[in-house]
């Protein structure tokens, strides 16, 4: 096979966008479809989402969240009930206006999100404080007709997500859940995807339309120097409950009632793209080992036409024994026993698909009761005993995960610049960093920062998008007595800025 067709032709450090597309397509995570911005999720990518689905479902069920499913269509009248909410999505809403040749009198939208679909039911189901809290979650797809450039996993017209919708009698309960869910999202990235994230609160300009406030986790993509919103947890306050008349009596026997406090929260398949962008290299995809569909591939080595039948059968039996050990211990293992391709071809085949560990087993390995273990992320090799090999492999999976997270964290931290002036701000931005800067918190100032930082990249003919607030990180250091980097007003908090997807 032509090496140029089999391997990557773009370099991560030279053409990041092309490199990324090659990683996820040649790595068989995703494929293109006839409609721009819609993608085919291949089994390798879908398995990662399945791991996230399984882990998160278990965690939220422990919090009392129940799974449900609501229709994907929303009447125009319902979608437009919350002004700020609909304005947030209006340019991206896809409308169904015809059925065959018949124009519909009442157009319906395909859900961009489900608040206005779900909350009419909440108003029917909630009457008493005994009906609270109500905690629902659905796994589904949404459609947002992106008008800007699309990028697989990161920004598409249709994508998969989960969306949680909850209602509480008190603000305290609501606020506690917002942060509890945000912590779970952070754990998805750290414990499954080996990706570090920053937890914080969105600015007023960047919060979800119709929310009291929005919290988010933000990741950093070193290859592009951009931040990316990794998940969000919103406090809706009583905004939607007032709109949809969702009320509950406040006490036993009381005739008074109050509007409930609501939250919504979600994570999407963007998470898969974030992990691929951060961990992959110029050889192809690098999958976090805990979510890889195949965690270990076994490649027999040294079998040729000159090998005796008895030796070959002995080696195959030895390899099968290793494979059974791993399978019985719950390791996801694949034996590549194809006879029509070389061992070298198999190495390349599995490297580009990101399989975390490779076991190379030949006649010498069998003679010493060993196998050669190769890590995908570092390409480091070592001989391991086949006695207790399942335990060895499981330890290596954890070590690899921890190493990947540590490397990504170190890289991210080295690219966070603390600045005190707009000149330092722009220098850091042009060096593809994200920035912690003292900021006044005023919306008009944020708009001006984005405008001022939109300029031609000095290293190309491309106009770089402006920086925006990514979040106001929780636990960031105080900025007492400092001035805003843009308007020179009194700064109220250090804020994370950056160009973003």
UniProtKB/Swiss-Prot annotation:
The keyword Signal does not apply. GO terms for molecular function: ATP binding; proline-tRNA ligase activity. It comes from the Eukaryota. SUPFAM superfamilies: C-terminal domain of ProRS, Class II aaRS ABD-related, Class II aaRS and biotin synthetases. It catalyses: tRNA(Pro) + L-proline + ATP = L-prolyl-tRNA(Pro) + AMP + diphosphate. Keywords: Aminoacyl-tRNA synthetase, ATP-binding, Ligase, Nucleotide-binding, Protein biosynthesis. InterPro entries: aa-tRNA-synt_IIb, aa-tRNA-synth_II, aa-tRNA-synth_II/BPL/LPL, Anticodon-bd, Anticodon-bd_dom_sf, Pro-tRNA-ligase_IIa, Pro-tRNA-ligase_IIa_arc-type, Pro-tRNA_ligase_II_C. PROSITE patterns: AA_TRNA_LIGASE_II (PS50862). It is an enzyme of class 6 (ligase). It holds the Pfam family HGTP_anticodon. HAMAP family: Pro_tRNA_synth_type3. This is Proline--tRNA ligase.
